[in-house]
């Protein structure tokens, strides 16, 4: 897994191409990310990775072991930690600051991890997209789940059965999104579309897209289309975030 960054979903806006085409984008703003700990196969950890942290925290909100961990590596107290598997940990050191221009550039494909919007208790039609029952001929259960099992054998409801329950507020990873533009002065990037998980001001983690062999051809086509967008972007276009 390559190096990524911890950021915040800000909101949506749009950018214009030279031919006047409007491209909807989501703004992701990054605080300063710190390398907290460097792990390698040559240490007791036994594998190559970087522990990255962001968003400064108050001491009263952290446990004593975590406070000691931050002080040991000479970094500020941080609220969010994430570990990225890397091939070159020797190029980094504890306390090093990571910024968006060091990791992402326009034209990249990225994967975005976040917590989806919580929608509370929901029925099967909303939660699982069930069709429901007929609306006519005296049917009494229009939005019900229907049968949930068999008979004496197996005599139970199968684990994983799609039923009503809590909808959303779960980890989601959206793959293969486009980086349209980078804003180094704001430490932010613009990602094409609105597919990022979670609400505005929610924490997201961006990583370079994992190359999946089955989708290699479509990924290359995506990158060609994205390169056209990047080359034809109107640089002077305002990127003010829309209020939501």
Swiss-Prot record:
GO cellular component terms given for this protein: cytosolic large ribosomal subunit
InterPro entries: Ribosomal_uL3, Ribosomal_uL3_bac/org-type, Ribosomal_uL3_CS, Transl_B-barrel_sf
Keyword Manganese applies: no
A Pfam family per the record: Ribosomal_L3
Top-rank taxon, per record: Bacteria
Keywords in alphabetical order: Ribonucleoprotein, Ribosomal protein, RNA-binding, rRNA-binding
Keyword rRNA-binding: yes
GO molecular function term, any single one: structural constituent of ribosome
Biological process according to GO: translation
Assembly: Part of the 50S ribosomal subunit. Forms a cluster with proteins L14 and L19.
Role this protein plays: One of the primary rRNA binding proteins, it binds directly near the 3'-end of the 23S rRNA, where it nucleates assembly of the 50S subunit.
Family: Belongs to the universal ribosomal protein uL3 family.
HAMAP family in the cross-refs: Ribosomal_uL3_B (MF_01325_B)
Protein name: Large ribosomal subunit protein uL3
Organism: Aquifex pyrophilus
Lineage, broadest ranks: Bacteria, Pseudomonadati, Aquificota, Aquificia, Aquificales
Encoding gene per record: rplC
């Amino acid at each position: 897994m390559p190096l990524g960054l911890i950021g915040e979903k800000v909101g949506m806006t749009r950018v214009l191409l030279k031919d006047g085409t409007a491209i909807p984008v989501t703004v992701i703003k990054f605080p300063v990310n710190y390398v907290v700990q460097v792990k390698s196969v040559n240490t007791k950890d036994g594998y190559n990775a970087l522990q990255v942290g962001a968003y400064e925290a108050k001491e009263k909100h952290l446990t004593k072991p975590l406070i000691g961990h931050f002080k040991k590596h000479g970094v500020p107290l941080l609220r969010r930690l994430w570990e990225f598997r890397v091939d070159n940990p020797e190029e980094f050191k504890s306390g090093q600051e990571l910024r968006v221009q060091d990791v992402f550039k326009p034209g990249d494909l990225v994967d975005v991890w976040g917590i989806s919007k919580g929608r509370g208790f929901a029925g099967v039609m909303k939660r699982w997209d069930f069709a429901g029952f007929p609306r006519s001929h005296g049917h009494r259960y229009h939005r019900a789940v229907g049968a949930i099992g068999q008979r004496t054998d197996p005599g139970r409801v199968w684990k994983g059965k799609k039923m009503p329950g809590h909808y959303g507020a779960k980890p989601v990873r959206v793959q293969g999104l486009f980086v349209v533009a980078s804003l180094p002065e704001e430490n932010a990037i613009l990602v094409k579309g609105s597919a990022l998980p979670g609400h505005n001001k929610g924490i997201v983690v961006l990583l370079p897209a994992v190359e999946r062999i089955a989708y290699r051809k479509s990924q290359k086509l995506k990158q060609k289309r994205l390169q056209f967008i990047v080359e034809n972007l109107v640089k002077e276009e305002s990127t003010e975030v829309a209020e939501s």
